[in-house]
UniProtKB/Swiss-Prot annotation:
The name this protein goes by in its record: Small ribosomal subunit protein uS8
Subunit structure: Part of the 30S ribosomal subunit. Contacts proteins S5 and S12.
Keyword Ribonucleoprotein annotated: yes
GO terms, molecular function: rRNA binding; structural constituent of ribosome
Keywords associated with the record: Ribonucleoprotein, Ribosomal protein, RNA-binding, rRNA-binding
Domain of life (superkingdom): Bacteria
Family: Belongs to the universal ribosomal protein uS8 family.
GO cellular component, one term: ribosome
Gene3D superfamilies in the cross-refs: 3.30.1370.30, 3.30.1490.10
Signal sequence region: none
Originating species: Exiguobacterium sibiricum (strain DSM 17290 / CCUG 55495 / CIP 109462 / JCM 13490 / 255-15)
Gene Ontology annotations of biological process type: translation
Length: 132
C-alpha cells in the first residue's frame, strides 16, 4: 500500500499510542520523520527516539513521555499542511500554538524547526503540524 502522507501517519501513530498509554511505538523511518521526532524530544514532548537500521528504509522507535501520575505530556497533535492543501507562512505570520504553550513544526529552507526558532531566524516555510 502506498502511503500518501507519511507525516500524518506518524502523528496518528503517536496520537493512538498516547491515548492507550503505550511506552513506545515503531514506524517506518524517513528523514523528515526523524527531524520531527528530534524536535519533539528536544521540546520535551517525548522521552527518546531511536533509529534502527535494517535492509530497507529503517525503523524509528519513539518512546512516549508521561507525567508523575501517568498523565499525558502530549494532549493534542494536528496536521496543518497536507498534500492536497499546503499551508505556508512568512516568518512574522507563523502562528503561536495555544498562546505559546504548544509548538508549531515548520519546514523551512534552513531545515525543520519549531515556530519559535523560525521566528528567531526570520525564516518562513511550510507549517507541518501543531503539537500541544
Amino acid at each position: 500500500m502506498v502511503m500518501t502522507d507519511p507525516i500524518a501517519d506518524m502523528l496518528t501513530r503517536i496520537r493512538n499510542a498516547n491515548m492507550v498509554r503505550h511506552e513506545k511505538l515503531e514506524m517506518p523511518a524517513s528523514t523528515i520523520k526523524r527531524e520531527v521526532a528530534e524536535i519533539l524530544k528536544r521540546e520535551g514532548f517525548i522521552r527518546d527516539v531511536e533509529y534502527l537500521e535494517d535492509s530497507k528504509q529503517g525503523t524509528l522507535r519513539v518512546f512516549l513521555k508521561y507525567g508523575a501520575s501517568n498523565e499525558r505530556v502530549i494532549t493534542g497533535l494536528k496536521r496543518i499542511s497536507k498534500p492536497g492543501l499546503r499551508v505556508y507562512a512568512k516568518a512574522d505570520e507563523i502562528p503561536k500554538v495555544l498562546g505559546g504553550l504548544g509548538i508549531a513544526i515548520v519546514s523551512t529552507s534552513k531545515g525543520v524547526m519549531t515556530d519559535k526558532e523560525a521566528r528567531q531566524q526570520k525564516v518562513g516555510g511550510e507549517v507541518i503540524a501543531y503539537i500541544w
